[in-house]
Amino acid sequence: MYKASANILIACSFLWLTACSSAGVVTEDLIPTDYVNPFIGASTSVGAAGVYHGLGKTFPGATTPYGMVQVSPNTITGGDNSSGYSDEHKTIEGFAFTQMSGVGWFGDLGNFLVMPTTGELQKIAGKEDGSIKGYRSSYDKATETAKAGYYSVELTDYKIKVESSATPHCGILQFTFPSNEQSRIQIDLARRVGGTSTSQYVKVLDDYTIQGWMKCTPDGGGWGNGEGNSDYTVYYYAQFSKPLSNYGFWSADIPDEWVRKPDEVVSIPYLTRISQAPVIKDKKELEGKHLGFFTEFPTKEGEQVEMKVGISFVDMEGAANNFKQEIASKNFAQVKQEASDLWNKELSRIRISGGTDDEKTVFYTSLYHTMIDPRIYTDVDGRYIGGDKKVHEQDGTFTKRTIFSGWDVFRSQFPLQAMINPRLVSDALNSLITMADQSRREYYERWELLNSYSGCMIGNPALSVLADAYMKGIRTYDVEKAYQYAVNTSAKFGNDSLGYTPEPLSISYTLEYAYADWCVAQLAKALGKEEDAKRFYEKGQAYRNMFDAEKGWFRPRNADGSWKAWPENALTEEWYGCIESNAYQQGWFVPHDVPGMVELMGGKEEVIANLTNLFDHTPSDMLWNDYYNHANEPVHFVPFLFNQLDVPWYTQKWTRYICKNAYANKVEGIVGNEDVGQMSAWYILAASGIHPSCPGNTRMEITSPVFDKVEFNLDSQYHQGKVFTIIAHNNNTNNLYIQKALLNGKEYNKCYLDFAEIAAGGTLELFMGDKPNTEWGVLSNI
């Protein structure tokens, strides 16, 4: 949609059809892509977020569902700007063909940066603040357009319109040039988000085609400023619609001793060295440390030039084959339409009715963001780079995928996918299992990027995803091997030596490890491994070792058993025993043993009062804060605790409040990093009226839906039913409390569903009112 009118949807752009269901609720036959606004979350701004993490960090460019390629504008290189784009920036430095979505820790990818220019050749992008000039261009915000599978903008410095679209393995750029004798397409082959590729190669194959590669190692920064251990090579096969009659290279001689990390590659000495690089025009191929390529040509007013690119992480032959199979014979309009069709098909896994246009846009954009990762990592022929850095070929049982942001996505993203796309969950698990196998590490990584064991964040989140999948009937992988690797993971990273994990970050580590061990216990019990189940259930109780009865709360503990000093603001002091949170937020993370947690905390009434205080002190803008901090993951289960405390109306109240205040149809519409689908998946589930409270069991909490009707299309390979529907009668912004419920036409008085009831298909009807019904859903859970 046009950003200038992002809150407006043109009614005539789709057909409204109505059909009365048996429950008397109108069904809308809408087109999901009409409600996707890729600008939501597309900001890294620290100022707008009020915290170093920034906002959503999503990208607005074109991609396909779970595609390998993302063709997106980039406005900044260096720093912690993982998407390469931030809406408040006034200039664009180019259009990359790979991007990460919604993450921190410097990010990575952003490779193969293409920029159309005119006039004198510039070899550096320059700086966003204008202090150093280069080929970057200002752009007209009013012309910036983004839809599912399409992006366009006008570069005002060059008077060039740029449009992008994508197939799963390829991207396409269409440039509309002005009349100019020196028009140009130039490519920065060294560019990489959060750093640089460390070596590159380019070869001119014929009058229209180039191919090559860009090698990215930790020495060039990237993921975690190099600490994330990302080590990959991007291969490309690029074809231009105009002949390469006047082309050239530039190659900067970077001294071996120079540091090439995010800050250094945008420093004045580094940029000076690149700007002084000689132009080379007498060769067909070149390899170097910092290469660029350009092709120049005259253009007429309004002349369109296309550039198509195939991408592979395997080899140059793979990039060429991806190109030939997916995009060689297609023009821009065809690629754009096919991308839109792919998105409509995937987004139709959930159908909604009711809500405002803005709420529909938040919903379908959220669903869109959950369908970026885990992305495909195989070429069209099934080949991929494995955990041993060798070429493998998938056997047809699964699709190899990459980007597993475990600490984030086990909470909502994978439970959502277990409902609407269980094959994706199976793919992700098979990908983690094969990586552990091929690398010979035989344990699960908590944050995987392109086969890297990055060690990012904490806990053992893959154990949660595995247990949750198994308990929900997703078992299309080597179960015994998967289980053994789970046991190995717990042994390598856990609370075994002391019964807790000592400082630093002892609260977070201990509680997260305890939950993961409970997940292994669930698996062991289901597999008939009774001794293992008993042992891991006991390990799941390790959270108790971090609770200081004198203080009445979880407290950091040292290796010698002593407690860390208790400051005056112990509960709300960020990093006091906790990662990216405080003890007041992290301390609620005992999802696998809520009764035990409540007992430690002084009983149900005490806990309800404490939870109420947590929410009452939360700022209305929901930005980063010391209380209910929805901008980060540790609290994402907390609103659903009220269901288990026999006050489900508080779950209903606060989830509706969060949906309204933490999400919006605007750039700043995600209050924290989107985190590879997690923030979006939370909204989709909560706004639909259900959400897990403890992945690894099959309980799904019922809450107050934003929408009048939500239909989840199920997968017949994994589920017995075809559709599970949630209907909210008499639903509006005031009537947010559930008065009664029917499940498949029969009275239902539980505030939760079992996943089997969802998988069987059927209908949950909720009857809403403006006051809490303090009798519905009260089952003395504790």
Residue ranges and their predicted role:
Residues 25-414, 418-464, 470-511, 524-545, ...:
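Accessory carbohydrate-recognition regions in carbohydrate-active enzymes
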Residues 1-9:
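Bacterial N-terminal signal peptides that target proteins for export
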Residues 10-15:
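Hydrophobic helical h-region of N-terminal Sec-dependent signal peptides
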Residues 18-19:
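C-terminal motif of bacterial Sec signal peptides marking the signal peptidase cleavage site
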Residues 516:
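ATP-dependent phospho-/nucleotidyl transfer catalytic cores
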